[in-house]
Amino acid sequence: MAGCCCLSAEEKESQRISAEIERQLRRDKKDARRELKLLLLGTGESGKSTFIKQMRIIHGSGYSDEDRKGFTKLVYQNIFTAMQAMIRAMDTLRIQYMCEQNKENAQIIREVEVDKVTALSRDQVAAIKQLWLDPGIQECYDRRREYQLSDSAKYYLTDIERIAMPSFVPTQQDVLRVRVPTTGIIEYPFDLENIIFRMVDVGGQRSERRKWIHCFESVTSIIFLVALSEYDQVLAECDNENRMEESKALFRTIITYPWFLNSSVILFLNKKDLLEEKIMYSHLISYFPEYTGPKQDVKAARDFILKLYQDQNPDKEKVIYSHFTCATDTENIRFVFAAVKDTILQLNLREFNLV
């Protein structure tokens, strides 16, 4: 140590800089450890993008008036997409319009180029209103499992009066319900208790899944979303394949990937509100003959579907943390994510020097 006294000013400065660099590297390493990567997975329309929007509302800056205005044309486009889907299904399902005038109204809506829509004309609004009130369209809506229709169709169409007003600015709920298929990878980082949660949302449609592999490094937790209401629906990409069977097979593939051996798995059984509605008229046993519970029983249906997914786990040592959710309900997601955050931190105590 005596030699230190003989160091030149230049050497002392060099040592100081080296020590500072060492300290910074240690800090950087610690900071890197204080980031959690949560990968949102699930088939198309399971609610992943809605969940990301909720994180922005609950843990981020939310949606300002200006942000919400930016969703206006998407709301309009969602309305036309839904009405056009029902008009096409009227032909396919051979349902008659009760009101003769609605054949003309259907033609008005049919001619709209959805991706070019930026406003609603008076004629279009009148046509949409009359069509939605037609008993034929209502029958077509009730048979929506036989074709592809967005979950938000009824929400927007029953509120067309408000949406058609010139002063219309989408509400937070309107924003949550906008359907835009995710293509590519969306990352949303937010800070919670000095830890960065980096949430990664990838497209759920089959064509998007090949991109997932780029996200598989250093994943702390998988959050896999299941749409409970899809037990009686077919895939958009393949109309003779049950959506829940596809989701179940995907879940099994994901949890057995070698990349995720050390990642915790959290299962969100989403759209519980839609299941409660649907189970009253669409019986689970018609699609899953192994179901032995009573008809029109929400709890029995939920428990059966949860077990379907739990049974995909071949590693009985690995715990699957499950929650029933409604991604469009901010309070429900606030409550559920608080529990998820605690679970994730609990599982990563040592890494974050919390013990």
Swiss-Prot record:
Family matches, as Pfam families: G-alpha (PF00503)
Keyword Lipid metabolism among UniProt keywords: no
Keyword Cell membrane among record annotations: no
Key words, A-Z: GTP-binding, Magnesium, Metal-binding, Nucleotide-binding, Transducer
PROSITE patterns according to UniProt: G_ALPHA
GO cellular component: heterotrimeric G-protein complex
Record region (G4 motif): 266-273
InterPro entries: Gprotein_alpha_Q (IPR000654), Gprotein_alpha_su (IPR001019), GproteinA_insert (IPR011025), P-loop_NTPase (IPR027417)
Domain of life from the UniProt record: Eukaryota
UniProt-annotated binding residues for Mg(2+): 49, 182
Stretches the record annotates as G1 motif: 37-50
One BP annotation, GO: G protein-coupled receptor signaling pathway
G3 motif: annotated span: 197-206
Binding-site list for GTP: 42-49, 176-182, 201-205, 270-273, 327
Subunit organization: G proteins are composed of 3 units; alpha, beta and gamma. The alpha chain contains the guanine nucleotide binding site.
Protein family per UniProt: Belongs to the G-alpha family. G(q) subfamily.
Protein name: Guanine nucleotide-binding protein subunit alpha-14
Gene symbol of the encoding locus: Gna14
